[in-house]
From Swiss-Prot:
Residues 841-866, 885-943 have a biased composition (Acidic residues). It comes from Saccharomyces cerevisiae (strain ATCC 204508 / S288c). Involved in nonsense-mediated decay of mRNAs containing premature stop codons. It interacts, via its C-terminus, with NAM7/UPF1. Could be involved in determining the efficiency of translational termination or reinitiation or factors involved in the initial assembly of an initiation- and termination-competent mRNP. The keyword Cytoplasm applies. This is Nonsense-mediated mRNA decay protein 2. The gene is NMD2. Its main location: cytoplasm.
């Protein structure tokens, strides 16, 4: 009905409600005869159909009908309920109802409205049959359209038009006080009915399509027809809520359907059969999902909303594959579906026999039985001899064109395929079955069941039927076997590899169909899972070497190496490299670690390849058994004294591995990451790193990726989501394996534990049981580490954050007090507080933590230990590895002297026997030269000291450049005068004989500290020393050399410290040491900051 006619009827019907006579009567005296009046009612009972309105309106204008008004109301109500949702029928109904309303106004319309509204009340009893439910929904859809049309033309307006309130349906009586628009109340009642089943979604979509102006604010064409001014807004709000619920339900059903498909697929592969419970549930969910999906698309397009993704697999399962830019590129052999074009045509292009089949079935005539029997025998003879594509295709056509198709022939064909023993003809027989599969489905189904049962009997018995396996493989290539049946066979063969012949069956099956399954897109994903299962099974310790070799051959069969890869030369490993690989990764727990250290020290360290292998072995702890990580650390600690730079490189690489693990955050690398943090912990336990390095690593693990390096429960860190507890496992692995707690570690441990506790609370609660146990064990281990103060755990996030804040404030207060005492607050903070309190506190006052934690400062240690005598040399921190080796030093020296005669500089920590018989005059010259070299080594003449002297010279040149011209000239002049005085002193003493008694002695001793280079050992002064003993000048040992001919003799002179010569030497040595330390700090700071 067009808008003009609607407005015309609306005007007439509104005037009728106001009591005006608007219906045109043919005559003033109406026909009151029974025949005429009952005839009108009979016409009404026929229903409102196209063409009936003119006859009914004519009778309505001529017949009296007053006495039959109640019967007319009942008849019209029944007719309205049965109006079909057709445009012409609805228009006819609107015209007739409008005419009746204009003729009788409220007397007719008021009871009609009450009776018609009963049709929209939802049934109180559930309708069991879905068919009946759909019929009811279709009827309600037509009734709603008729009601809306009558509402727009002004016939039905509001509940106030109903005179008897008892006639109002129950669902409207509850809401009479709310004064909602009548059409809105009806729609709300209809759309809420069994929403989860989606029956009413079709009503919603049909309504918005038919009455679109009711939902558009920019369309005012029907504003004059709407009785309630709030109707538009109410309908828009109602449908907005309905759309949100529809989208959510459609997405939920989409995930359920996909999940059900995946579970069914897994169940099929596991059992090899269709499961009725999955099929029934799927068949039940699919129609509901289709209803919601269709409704969501329609509503989304109408209201211009973003429609959720409901096609194909769920978003979580989508895997995008990059398509190649070159469409005609030649794939490598292992990625080709078929070996060549002829093979592709054989399996993919089947002959079209549809016309032959239709002719055979439509014009089949009775033939002579003898002739028919001859034809059948000839057909089977030719079938037995068929060996190529053309012949088998011709036989497919002959079968139908010769009218051979009947039940007996089909059974004979099935028996023929079961009994044939010629393996070479199985591909053409499979092609025959594939060509006729559409017309003989029962033969295909029976033959597949035969192959399936035969296959099942082989899986668990000591039998093998190669013919059936090959036939099964050929049927796979023609895609006649269901995918679940294929992968059930493969999976079962892999899982029960110990059953005799299963590996042979799997080899035959994959030899004939493996590449097809691997490269066919429909099977590729499942086949890759099967290949991974084979690779995992290959690592099963229960399998013998023959089984593992067979599985390796299957993988090679599926992924054959290219000719290019076969020609590539394999990297060869030297026997020495192979020896150290086996020693560290296989035999680490079989030998004493001291022996392993000796073997590693004897490696050819000058060979770069050997160094690379050893570096890889000591920097990849995940490649050894987890229980052997402490042993690996022991060996590394044993090397520290001899290969310090190498050990530092290994530790740096472990720290880099931990950093890399945080950046990549790959689930598959979790065990690697655990191994690395355990290795770092053991390195700390063996005193090769300071506690600051370990603490910084723990903080870095916790804070990595968080905003401002601070974990916050209100901001999502994608690399560390709230439901990922792996970082907690890393931290607890470190803390639970710490075996020593130096003072510097204990000092900062409380803040670390409090911060770690806060971090655990920002995770989703409750924690998993295993994680909770590890956290509890960690806090229990450290609860008594702080002396009398016991660490108390918090109950929740708020309490933990409060305690952490209080601890930070107290530490900041102590830090500020110390800075004021030192007078350096301004230089450290620049008048501001640190932006990150935890960082500022954990990194605060490094100078105060220069103590070695009873361990080793790898970067800032003094060089004194390096240039100490060989007899007293030991690794910094005196770790266990060095102590265990001390008893074997003498035995080692003989071997090492033989190995290292040509390279003394590489002997970083080796010790030799020292000859104590210095005054033996009968020694030859070689022995004396050896003694001299040992003496030089004892007093610092090693490479490290030379390097320090060179660094001192470079630093002096650097300072010299900073001075102006006048200062440099003054220093040069002073140096020349000093050299001149020294030369004069030497010339004057050439002929002078030195007598100890003539050495001048100063009355008061000069208090000068003795340098480490010149003193061997010094016992602490006793508290019982007398004043005279304390006042005596201390003496320094000097070696006095005399040469007589070729023989050189030496003797020790004890010179007092108050002699000017001695004091000058002491001051020079002290100055040299101080400058050396300054240079070292500058260089190290520049290198490692």
């Amino acid at each position: 009905m067009d808008d003009g006619r609607k407005k015309e009827l609306h005007d007439l019907n509104t005037r009728a409600w106001n009591g005006e006579e608007v219906f045109p009567l043919k005559s003033k005296k109406l026909d009151s005869s029974i025949k005429r009046n009952t005839g009108f009612i009979k016409k009404l009972k026929k229903g409102f159909v196209k063409g009936s309105e003119s006859s009914l309106l004519k009778d309505l204008s001529e017949a009296s009908l007053e006495k039959y008004l109640s019967e007319i109301i009942v008849t019209v109500t029944e007719c309205l309920l049965n109006v079909l949702n057709k445009n012409d029928d609805v228009i006819a109904a609107v015209e007739i109802i409008s005419g009746l309303h204009q003729r009788f106004n409220g007397r007719f319309t008021s009871p009609l409205l009450g009776a018609f509204l009963q049709a929209f009340e939802n049934p109180s009893v559930d309708i069991e049959s879905e068919r009946d439910e759909l019929q009811r929904i279709t009827r309600v859809k037509g009734n709603l359209r008729v009601f809306t049309e009558l509402y727009l033309v002004g016939v039905f307006r509001t509940l106030d038009d109903i005179e008897s309130k008892d006639a109002i349906p129950n669902f409207l009586q509850k809401k009479t006080g709310r004064k909602d628009p009548l059409l809105f109340s009806i729609l709300r009642e209809i759309l809420n009915y069994k929403f989860k089943l989606g029956f009413t979604t079709t009503i919603a979509t049909a309504f918005i399509k038919k009455f679109a102006p009711l939902f558009r604010d920019d369309d005012n064409s029907w504003d004059d027809l709407i009785y309630d001014s709030k109707l538009k807004g109410a309908l828009q709000s109602l449908f907005k809520n309905f759309i949100d619920a529809t989208f959510a339900r459609a997405t939920e059903l989409h995930k359920k359907v996909n999940k059900l498909q995946r579970e069914h697929q897994k169940c099929q592969i596991r059992t090899g059969k269709l499961r009725d419970e999955y099929v029934e549930e799927y068949d039940k969910l699919l129609p509901i999902f289709i209803r919601f999906k269709t409704s969501a698309i329609t509503l989304g397009e109408f209201f211009k909303l973003e429609i959720p993704e409901l096609e194909g697999a769920s978003n979580d399962d989508l895997k995008e594959t990059a398509s190649p830019m070159i469409t005609n590129q030649i794939l490598p052999p292992n990625q080709r579906l078929w070996e060549n074009e002829d093979t592709r045509k054989f399996y993919e292009i089947l002959p079209d026999i549809s016309k032959t089949v239709e002719e055979s079935q439509s014009s089949k005539t009775e033939k002579d039985s003898n002739v028919n029997s001859k034809n059948i025998n000839l057909f089977f003879t030719d079938l037995e001899m068929a060996d190529c594509k053309d012949i088998i295709d011709d036989l497919s056509n002959r079968y139908w064109s010769s009218y051979l198709d009947n039940k007996a022939t089909r059974n004979r064909i099935l028996k023929f395929f079961m009994e044939t023993q010629d393996w070479s003809k199985l591909p053409v027989y499979s092609r025959f079955i594939a060509t006729n599969s559409k017309y003989m489905p029962e033969i295909v189904s029976e033959f597949i069941n035969y192959l399936d049962n035969g296959f099942r009997s082989q899986l668990h018995s000591n039998k093998i039927n190669v013919k059936n396996i090959i036939f099964f493989s050929e049927m796979i290539k023609f895609q006649l076997i269901p995918s679940f049946m294929i992968f059930h066979k493969i999976r079962t063969l892999i899982m029960y590899m110990q059953v005799p012949n299963n590996v042979e069956i799997l080899t035959v099956l994959l030899e004939h169909s493996g590449k097809f399954l691997l490269n066919k897109p429909e099977y590729k994903e499942l086949m890759e899972k099967m290949v991974q299962l084979i690779k995992d099974k290959k690592n099963d310790r229960q399998l013998n070497m023959n089984m593992k070799s067979a599985l390796e051959n299957i993988i090679t069969l599926l992924y054959p190496p290219s000719v290019k890869s076969l020609n590539v030369t394999v990297k060869t490993i030297t026997p020495e490299q192979q020896f150290y690989r086996i020693l560290i990764r296989s035999e680490l727990s079989s030998l004493d670690f001291k022996h392993i250290v000796k073997l590693v020290r004897k490696a050819h360290w000058d060979d770069v390849a050997i160094q690379k292998v050893l570096f890889s072995l000591f920097s990849k702890p995940h490649k050894i058994s987890y229980q052997n990580i402490p042993l690996l650390t022991k060996v590394l600690g044993g090397l520290y004294s001899y290969r310090r730079d190498f050990v530092i490189r290994c530790i740096d690489q472990v720290l880099e591995n931990i950093e890399r693990g945080l950046e990549i955050n790959d689930y598959g690398q979790n065990m690697h990451r655990i191994s690395n943090v355990r290795y770092l912990t053991e390195i700390f336990n063996f005193e090769m790193i300071k506690s600051d390095v370990l603490l910084d690593t723990i903080y870095h693990i916790i804070r990595f990726g968080h905003i401002n390096n601070q974990p916050n429960p209100f901001y999502l860190n994608y690399s560390d989501p709230p439901d990922n507890y792996f970082r907690i496992q890393l931290v607890t692995t470190i803390l639970l394996n710490i075996n020593r707690t130096p003072a510097a570690f204990t000092k900062k441990c409380k803040l670390l534990l409090r911060f770690f506790e806060y971090y655990t609370f920002i995770k989703e609660q409750p924690l998993p049981k295993e994680t909770e146990f590890r956290v509890s064990s960690t806090f229990k281990k450290y609860e008594n580490i702080f002396g009398n103060t016991k660490f108390e755990r918090s109950e929740n996030l708020v309490e933990s954050a409060s305690r952490l804040e209080s601890l930070l404030k107290s530490l900041n207060a102590i830090k500020s007090k110390d800075d004021r005492v030192k007078g350096s607050s301004a230089s450290i903070h620049n008048g501001k507080e640190s932006a990150v309190p935890i960082e500022s506190i954990t990194e605060d006052d490094e100078d105060e933590d220069d103590e070695n934690d009873d361990g080793v400062d790898l970067l800032g240690e003094d060089e004194d230990a390096e240039i100490s005598t060989p007899n007293t040399e030991s690794a910094p921190g005196k770790h266990q590895a060095k102590q265990d080796e001390s008893e074997d030093e003498d035995d080692e020296d003989d071997d090492e002297d033989d190995d290292d005669d040509d390279d003394d500089d590489d002997d970083d920590g080796e010790e030799g026997d020292e000859d104590d018989d210095e005054d033996d005059d009968d020694e030859d010259d070689d022995d004396e030269e050896e003694e001299d070299s040992d003496s030089d080594l004892e007093y610092g003449g090693d490479l490290d000291a030379d390097r320090d002297i060179e660094m001192k010279r470079m630093y002096e040149e650097y300072e010299r450049k900073l001075k102006d011209e006048e200062e440099r000239k003054a220093e040069e002049e002073l140096e020349r005068q000093f050299q001149k005085m020294m030369q004069e002193s030497i010339d004057a003493r050439k002929s002078e004989k030195v007598v100890a008694s003539k050495i001048p002695v100063i009355s008061k001793p000069v208090s000068v500290q003795k340098p480490l280079l010149l003193k061997k050992s010094e016992e602490p002064s006793s508290s019982k020393e007398t004043y005279e003993e304390l006042s005596k000048p201390k003496k320094i040992a000097f070696t006095f050399l005399t040469k007589s001919g070729k023989k050189t003799q030496s003797r020790i002179l004890q010179l007092p410290t108050d002699v000017k010569f001695v004091s000058d030497v002491l001051e020079e040595e002290e100055k040299l040491k101080t400058e050396r330390n300054k240079i070292k700090k500058i260089v190290l700071k520049r290198s490692f900051d």
